[in-house]
Structures are given as structure tokens and as C-alpha cells.
Amino acid sequence: MIDFGNFYQQIAKGPLSHWLNTLPSQLSSWQQESLHGKFKLWFNSLEHLPSLTPTTLDLNDSVTARMEPDISEGQREGIEKLLRNLMPWRKGPFSLYGVDINTEWRSDWKWQRVLPHISPLKNRLILDVGCGSGYHLWRMVGEGAMMAVGIDPMQLFLCQFEAVRKLLGDDQRAHVLPLGIEQLPELAAFDTVFSMGVLYHRRSPLDHLWQLKNQLVAGGELVLETLVIEGDENQVLVPGERYAQMRNVYFIPSAAALTTWLEKCGFVDVRVVDVCTTTTQEQRRTDWMITESLAEFLDPEDPSKTVEGYPAPVRAVLVARKPGIYQP
């Protein structure tokens, strides 16, 4: 099964060492009691992937691995078949020895919108909440992060991350743990915490903001990306049963309301740094994610609305800081 031993060793002598009081037993219980019905199938594909170390690795402009001399066509076909066993791939894209994983989301576009507005990630300890396949973790490593830790309870995403890691020379600068943020103690250890595409899935969004704050060091930075609507600080959309065909969407505030929420939770220096309508070029069906995507979730006669009649998805990026003096 998944071995978290390297992660335990890495955090044993740093600001996350106190996490070892609870984390190993949590993950041991998960492996014994909570595995998804398809986990063994996914893990089997992961085990059969070759361990490759790229001669060229680009994590700054993409997640791209190459080897000189190139791998054989047979090897490439075998890798692609195993990676396709881990579909659907939602966050990416990845280019691994000529296998191009064309994911549902152009997560690189989101990264381009976020990166200019945040503190440099060099030598920072980072938490990415709801990290999915871990695409952004690798981009954080590319920016010089000391370590990028992702959490996501979806076990398929863990297998996708470990598959990519295996093809990147078993790179130990990034890690994914199959946990939700509510399962984390108040670590107060991360220099930067990301929560992107999570807040609207939370029944209690203010509790989520408090949970994020509790993971930050004094003066640490929160990067929050979520759905928003137009309006003043009093405007919040509470959708009915579905929003853009998603059942689990609870609160979509205006950017102004979200700013107020962050301030109410004790964050300071709150900034709205980007607001962007999600397009069908950024989120779409591909041959690596073959089910419905954004185009099917919008009103075919008026793409400014969802099929339910709500405003179409608009996403904002906010940056805020936990009070205190930041000490790198």
C-alpha cells in the first residue's frame, strides 16, 4: 500500500514534528478501514508503472518530464495505458515522456493568475487543501518551496499523484495525504496555505476559513480561490439542490462579502487580486476526462447562466495574512 514513511522522516525534525503525534495512526486506520472499493485496481496500475528519473524536468512553466535517450514507443504506450486506468484526470496538464495528460482543467491557467500576486514560495512550507492530483504542488516545488503538502480525501487523486511522482524520479519535495482539513490538528506551521476550489463545497464556510488560519504560522499567507457572484458585502448566493449540476455547493458570496468573512475570522491585509469567468476552454471534456464538463452545465441558449438559471461560474482569488510578524 501507500508508504508515508519518507514524509514522516522529513517532518520529524521540523515545524511539523508534532503532527507525528496523531498522523501515523490516522493513516494506518485509513489504510485498514477506509479504502475505496476501486483502490486495489488503482494501486495495481500504480505498482506496474516504471520508476523513471527524467534527464529534463520542467516544473516552472509546466509539469514536463523528458529523458535522453527517449523511452521506447512500447514503454510510452504501456505508461499511457496505466495512467488511463486512473481516469478521470481533472487537474493538470502533465507531459510525461511524451504522454500528454490533457486534463479537464487547465490548472496552469489558474496558476498563472495566482502566482504574480502571492509572496515568493522559495523555502516556504506549503499546505494545499483540496489538492486533487497534486498538479499545483509540483508548480509550488518549481517555485522553490521547501516542501509542498497536499491534502485531499479523494483516493483516486492520491493514486494519480503517486503515479506522477514515480515518473518524476520519486521526487520527495511534494506529498499528498488522503485527509480532509477537518482531520488536521491546529498545526500553525505552514508559511503559505492554499484553498482553491473548496470553500463553496463547505457547509460552514467560516469554519473552513478558521481551519485554514489555524494551519498558518504568525504572519503566514492564505491564498483563497473560490466561486463568487457580483454584489456588495451583503450578497451571498445559496443555490438550491444543484449549481452547475453540482449537488454539494452551499454558499457563493460576492468578493466583497468574502472579504468581510475573512476579516471576521481575523485575517488582515485582505486583497482581491483576480476575478475571472470560467470558460469552456479552461474547463472541458477531454479524452482523459470523458464525462460531462462545463459546456453541459451552462444554459445552451444563454451561457452567462447555469442550466439551473444561476449566474455562470466566476472565480476570484483573494490573498490574506494571519496576524503577527512573519519569521521565515
Curated annotation (Swiss-Prot):
Q: Listed disulfide bonds for this chain?
A: none
Single GO MF annotation: transferase activity, transferring alkyl or aryl (other than methyl) groups
List the Pfam families hit by this protein, alphabetically: Methyltransf_9 (PF08003)
Cross-referenced InterPro entries: CmoB, Mo5U34_MeTrfas-like, SAM-dependent_MTases_sf
Query: What is the top-level taxon of the source organism?
Result: Bacteria
Q: Which family does it belong to?
A: Belongs to the class I-like SAM-binding methyltransferase superfamily. CmoB family.
How does it associate, per the subunit comment? Homotetramer.
Q: Matching NCBIfam families, A to Z? A: PRK15068.1, tRNA 5-methoxyuridine(34)/uridine 5-oxyacetic acid(34) synthase CmoB
Q: What is this protein called?
A: tRNA U34 carboxymethyltransferase
Q: What is the lineage of its organism?
A: Bacteria, Pseudomonadati, Pseudomonadota, Gammaproteobacteria, Enterobacterales
